[in-house]
Amino acid sequence: MKWVTFLLLLFISGSAFSRGVFRREAHKSEIAHRFKDLGEQHFKGLVLIAFSQYLQKCPYEEHIKLVQEVTDFAKTCVADENAENCDKSIHTLFGDKLCAIPKLRDNYGELADCCAKQEPERNECFLQHKDDNPNLPPFQRPEAEAMCTSFQENPTSFLGHYLHEVARRHPYFYAPELLYYAEKYNEVLTQCCTESDKAACLTPKLDAVKEKALVAAVRQRMKCSSMQRFGERAFKAWAVARMSQRFPNAEFAEITKLATDVTKINKECCHGDLLECADDRAELAKYMCENQATISSKLQACCDKPVLQKSQCLAEIEHDNIPADLPSIAADFVEDKEVCKNYAEAKDVFLGTFLYEYSRRHPDYSVSLLLRLAKKYEATLEKCCAEGDPPACYGTVLAEFQPLVEEPKNLVKTNCELYEKLGEYGFQNAVLVRYTQKAPQVSTPTLVEAARNLGRVGTKCCTLPEAQRLPCVEDYLSAILNRLCVLHEKTPVSEKVTKCCSGSLVERRPCFSALTVDETYVPKEFKAETFTFHSDICTLPDKEKQIKKQTALAELVKHKPKATEDQLKTVMGDFAQFVDKCCKAADKDNCFATEGPNLVARSKEALA
């Protein structure tokens, strides 16, 4: 991915961090330094998240003991930085704690082999054993009264359990952001637990926090995947495009500085350096608030908030207004006769400036699209600057962008129209059929999860103003497809999925969109037990009922990959009527037992 090399020269000139944010040499004890910077509450929360993300099976009580031991040790080092072991790196201290856990091999198998390694290999080994799909039961929210009682009796323990349960299910969750969501959780409970109808107050508010947190989890996993697979340069390119969209009035040097710092912070969190990551994120927020004049006119409201809220607010900040007097981008990058000379003399800066200039003019594009355009521009210059008449060759490059722009625009239009016609559940089913046909080898639970998440794009994005739809849709789809890739990589079963997941991150969504029905797939045999249901479905929450039905739908498609829309509609309609009828019957069990085989026979016949 040489097209992201533009940042090389700019790294040398440094950033806010190189001017003194990170001065490790000034601190004899890294852990004392982080404890003093973060404060005890945030320090303990981050240590709990770190242990929960590494050792995902350990109960809360065991992790809390480790957290207290690390906190007590940090306090010792704050009092005397020369005390024994205070000069050790945080990775060494944490790794030693993990490796001292009794029965580590019994509970975690090969992870125990990491303990034979030295740092930094030991930490790398721990990271490789993080499980994106741990075998943990779905998190069940307690009843409102019980939740409030537990919260009011011991708020610290209650919120600690929240951090533990989320972190161990999402081992790459952005740690300082998870602290923010715990803070929001605390606010909701503090407000609602004094209400007469606690459930009515809690449910919608906690649902909203949960939805935002789940989206944050998949977005951060994509960032870590990008870092792991393609390195820091690819991530920095993403950051330059995103920052240029948000802060179009900032100079290129400022944008590059911010992008470099954001990359460093994300690398730390993805690498398990949660204390450093959170500390540096707070420093970046401080820098941005001290330099509002050169960044954006929209920052002030964020800068008045406490540290966690400030950083989160800055991360979600609305785009600043685009300068009114921006010249045509063609002037410097197409019409200038010195384009090839400028490109050859400083490719890094020239391509970086192009990405910056194009991105600041297009807040209505997704970051993935902007990076595809930058890639196209570089490929054009590489080709044309080697020819006899370069200006004639690259003169049409901006027009050649049009097909790349139209493809995601058409995707948004088609899918939003389908969503408006079918609603969220119907749209999820359409996506499920589409992806089961593309990759029928993928496990049904994974397909159902992916389709349900992909299907939510309509609710999230299709109601937004036109200018916000494309970036919302494509950036959200990219994050969800990354989750599919992460799960598939663990147990690869589809060559098509492997191909899309192995290529460039910015080409991944178009790759999946272009997949067609897998002609090599041998249909599954029709098994009656797959479509046999019992009365327990009647008492399931609506979400669980939907998942049961969608599981059956995916299995139908695997049995008949080329089934028509009408065939599937007939079978699923028949199934819905069957469930509705038997759930209303006086003798539900008898109804399911007698009507079930008839349903199976009709379904088999309809799909013949």
UniProtKB/Swiss-Prot annotation:
The modification N6-succinyllysine is found at K460, K543, K588. Disulfide bonds join C77-C86, C99-C115, C114-C125, C148-C193, C192-C201, C224-C270, C269-C277, C289-C303, C302-C313, C340-C385, C384-C393, C416-C462, C461-C472, C485-C501, C500-C511, C538-C583, C582-C591. One of its GO terms (biological process) is positive regulation of circadian sleep/wake cycle, non-REM sleep. The modification N6-methyllysine is found at K558. Interacts with FCGRT; this interaction regulates ALB homeostasis. Interacts with TASOR. In plasma, occurs in a covalently-linked complex with chromophore-bound alpha-1-microglobulin; this interaction does not prevent fatty acid binding to ALB. It comes from the Eukaryota. It comes from Rattus norvegicus. Belongs to the ALB/AFP/VDB family. Cu cation binds at H27. Plasma. The gene is Alb. Phosphorylated by FAM20C in the extracellular medium. InterPro entries: ALB/AFP/VDB, Serum_albumin-like, Serum_albumin/AFP/Afamin, Serum_albumin_CS, Serum_albumin_N. GO terms for cellular component: basement membrane; cytoplasm; extracellular exosome; extracellular region; extracellular space; protein-containing complex. Residues 19-211, 212-403, 404-601 form the Albumin domain. The modification Phosphothreonine is found at T444, T446, T570. GO terms for molecular function: DNA binding; enterobactin binding; enzyme binding; exogenous protein binding; fatty acid binding; identical protein binding; modified amino acid binding; protein-folding chaperone binding. Its main location: secreted. This is Albumin.
